[in-house]
């Protein structure tokens, strides 16, 4: 139900988090995954967002706030509750709209429901709102 490119990017950030021995994969990881998908990049560039700066800030936050497994423990990474809710919300919304799959922009909109996340704070600092993303989806649909 999740588009292949999005699934691959989520798998990549999950693998990276596991290699770094992180206990959780978070909303911030999910936003980093989205930063590797063309439709999200096109939208953010249209808003004149510095993608590298946003990615660096998210990675710094993850490094300083995500617990790490000790060396003597085999890491078994767990998705955070927020991460799970975003994906569940995206699947539900796609199903409600009678879409066959969830794409990156659907997930991007769902991130804004996790108001307490650092990812949403970073987006707001860059003057990106849920409404902006929804308008971006409408614009992309009109272009196709």
Question: What residues fall within each predicted segment?
Answer:
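Histone-fold recognition with a strong bias for associated Lys/Arg-rich disordered tails
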Residues: 1-144
């Amino acid at each position: 139900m999740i588009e292949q490119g999005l699934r691959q990017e989520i798998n990549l950030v999950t693998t990276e988090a596991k290699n770094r021995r992180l206990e959780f994969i978070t909303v911030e990881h999910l936003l980093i995954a989205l930063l590797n998908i063309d439709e999200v990049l096109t939208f953010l560039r249209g808003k004149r967002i510095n993608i590298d700066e946003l990615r660096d800030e998210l990675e710094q936050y993850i490094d300083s706030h995500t617990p790490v497994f000790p060396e003597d423990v085999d890491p078994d990474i767990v998705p955070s509750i927020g991460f799970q809710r975003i994906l569940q919300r995206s699947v539900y919304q796609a199903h409600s709209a009678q879409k066959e799959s969830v794409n990156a922009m659907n997930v991007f909109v769902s991130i804004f429901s996790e108001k307490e996340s650092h990812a949403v704070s970073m987006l707001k600092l860059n003057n990106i709102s849920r409404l902006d993303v929804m308008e971006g989806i409408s614009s992309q649909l009109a272009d196709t």
